[in-house]
Amino acid sequence: MVAESKAANPMREIVVKKLCINICVGESGDRLTRASKVLEQLCEQTPVLSRARLTVRTFGIRRNEKIAVHCTVRGKKAEELLEKGLKVKEFELKSYNFSDTGSFGFGIDEHIDLGIKYDPSTGIYGMDFYVVLGRRGERVAHRKRKCSRVGHSHHVTKEEAMKWFEKVHDGIIFQAKKKKKMIRRRRR
């Protein structure tokens, strides 16, 4: 009885809050501007350049150098782009793609699989998709006036996100192989 009433509540429905698409080029310059054009073509909005947090000498990256481009999409456009991205992955994800907070992410190798025409001057770029799931009513935690907390039962869990993916997108989730823990022996 309680489970049925929880399922019928429209506030309990899981929705896509936002979709973040990221292309990390690893260097600034011409390749980064071409990647931003690809992302602008895909999302139909202007992307934002991301900067490196640390200097990594082996990769030739300096701190605060522009190395990536990302775009945050919400609403119907986010659901359309998510559908295109999942088609490339054939609606198959692994269990470790899902986080404990109910979000999930995956990557694709070539942007031309999403339906964008190949341009030899642009090249081919891979990208990461990050999907943030939530429920209606979570605005109370983020608003400026009369801010309050969202209850623990209203948060999206990993299991709920996986069930949502299987139900809404008819997706398949593979169980990831468990990593063996290394036993460290003390030297005497």
Curated annotation (Swiss-Prot):
<dbReference type="GO" id="GO:0005737">
    <property type="term" value="C:cytoplasm"/>
</dbReference>
<dbReference type="InterPro" id="IPR031310">
    <property type="entry name" value="Ribosomal_uL5_N"/>
</dbReference>
<dbReference type="InterPro" id="IPR022803">
    <property type="entry name" value="Ribosomal_uL5_dom_sf"/>
</dbReference>
<keyword id="KW-0539">Nucleus</keyword>
<dbReference type="InterPro" id="IPR020929">
    <property type="entry name" value="Ribosomal_uL5_CS"/>
</dbReference>
<dbReference type="GO" id="GO:0006412">
    <property type="term" value="P:translation"/>
</dbReference>
<keyword id="KW-0694">RNA-binding</keyword>
<comment type="similarity">
    <text>Belongs to the universal ribosomal protein uL5 family.</text>
</comment>
<dbReference type="Pfam" id="PF00281">
    <property type="entry name" value="Ribosomal_L5"/>
</dbReference>
<dbReference type="InterPro" id="IPR031309">
    <property type="entry name" value="Ribosomal_uL5_C"/>
</dbReference>
<dbReference type="InterPro" id="IPR002132">
    <property type="entry name" value="Ribosomal_uL5"/>
</dbReference>
<keyword id="KW-0963">Cytoplasm</keyword>
<dbReference type="GO" id="GO:0019843">
    <property type="term" value="F:rRNA binding"/>
</dbReference>
<dbReference type="GO" id="GO:0005634">
    <property type="term" value="C:nucleus"/>
</dbReference>
<keyword id="KW-0699">rRNA-binding</keyword>
<dbReference type="GO" id="GO:0005840">
    <property type="term" value="C:ribosome"/>
</dbReference>
<dbReference type="GO" id="GO:1990904">
    <property type="term" value="C:ribonucleoprotein complex"/>
</dbReference>
<dbReference type="GO" id="GO:0003735">
    <property type="term" value="F:structural constituent of ribosome"/>
</dbReference>
<keyword id="KW-0689">Ribosomal protein</keyword>
<comment type="function">
    <text>Component of the ribosome, a large ribonucleoprotein complex responsible for the synthesis of proteins in the cell. The small ribosomal subunit (SSU) binds messenger RNAs (mRNAs) and translates the encoded message by selecting cognate aminoacyl-transfer RNA (tRNA) molecules. The large subunit (LSU) contains the ribosomal catalytic site termed the peptidyl transferase center (PTC), which catalyzes the formation of peptide bonds, thereby polymerizing the amino acids delivered by tRNAs into a polypeptide chain.</text>
</comment>
<comment type="subunit">
    <text>Component of the large ribosomal subunit.</text>
</comment>
<keyword id="KW-0687">Ribonucleoprotein</keyword>
<protein>
    <recommendedName>
        <fullName>Large ribosomal subunit protein uL5</fullName>
    </recommendedName>
</protein>
<dbReference type="Pfam" id="PF00673">
    <property type="entry name" value="Ribosomal_L5_C"/>
</dbReference>
